Structures are given as structure tokens and as C-alpha cells.
């Protein structure tokens, strides 16, 4: 009996050390930090995750909302095997599941945006035994019109440059075409003038010859 106690103690200590060395399992959440959308349109709130554990029926997803002007946190959406929409509140009939857990995507769709939808949307994923980790946050701004971002300005600049190049090419081609046409017209006029002068000279020669015969 006493001979087994040291062995158990060693195994217990070894187990504690292995537990301390084993990395803590945590779910990593990925969301766009800032999102801008136009009033009255629909928007996709993207949320993806990574987990050490395989995705199964134990996976749960919780979406909540914190208004920008303050107030209590509000329920938006819940997923566990099947999606559960809110039965009441501001998001009733305005939210839909648009995720695919097998692809680590737990995004949702928010329809008919309103200005009071401004605020922070949180995405929390638990995939036992991975239950720890930070909660994803999206700062949504509902605006009247979307402001131009750097990407929009870059696309506009590239489009304008391409349009300018096309216009320059068209102008050069037209210029060369009209230039060749004018040269051809000038050459044709020169030929006509020369032919008229030659014809006039021939007529004068004929007239002089006829005068010589009459003399």
C-alpha cells in the first residue's frame, strides 16, 4: 500500500506538468472592425472563426447589439444546430442566417437598415472544448450615402486614366486619318493642276502649229 503512494504522487505531478504545458484551447474570431452601409439597404455582417476542435453539434453562435447612443445590449441572433431568429424587438424579421459552420463562417444578414442600427455588433463562437477567446466586434455606421474610400478613389483614378488613354488614342488615330486625307486631297489637286496645265500647253501648241500652216 505504501509502496504505491510515491508512484501515484509522481504520476499526479507529471499530469499537472503536462496540463500546464498543454496550450489553452481558444476560438479565434475574425470580423471587419468597421463597416459602412446605406440606409434602407441590406448588409452582411461577416464573422469567421478558427478552432482546434472539430466543428460539431456543440457549436453555438451568439450575435448581440450595443446601440451607439447607449442603452442595454440587445439580442440579434443565435445558432445551435439550427438558426434561431429573434421573435420580438427591433431585429424581428430583419435578420437571417448566412453562415456555413463547416467553412468556419457564422455570418448573418441584416435587412432594411435604419439609422438607429448604428452601433456595435458582437459575434461570439463557442466550439467545445474550445470555449474561450475574444468576442468579435463590428462597428456599423448607417449613412445616407457611402463615402468614397481609398479603394474607391483608386478605382476612380484608374478608370479615369484608362478613359483618358482611350480618348488620346482616338484623337491620335483621327488626327492621322484626317492628315492622310488632306495629303491625298492636296496630291489629287496637284495632279489636276498639272493635267490642266499640260492640256493648256497642248492646246497652245496645236494652235501655234495651225497658225504656221495657215501662214
Curated annotation (Swiss-Prot):
Keyword NAD assigned to the entry: answer is: no
Q: Identify this protein by name.
A: Myelin protein zero-like protein 2
Which cysteine pairs are joined by S-S bonds?
47-123
Lineage, broadest ranks: Eukaryota, Metazoa, Chordata, Craniata, Vertebrata
Protein source organism: Bos taurus (Bovine)
Q: What is its main location?
A: membrane
Topology, Cytoplasmic side = 176-215
Q: Tell me the superkingdom of the source.
A: Eukaryota
Q: How does it sit in the membrane?
A: Single-pass type I membrane protein
Quote the SMART domains the UniProt record gives: IG, IGv
The gene name on file is: MPZL2
Localization, UniProt:
Membrane
Is Membrane tagged as a keyword?
yes
| Signal sequence residues | 1-26
Q: What does the function comment of this entry state?
A: Mediates homophilic cell-cell adhesion.
**What spans does the record annotate as topological domain Extracellular, numbered to this chain?**
27-154
According to the record, which residues are glycosylated?
39, 118
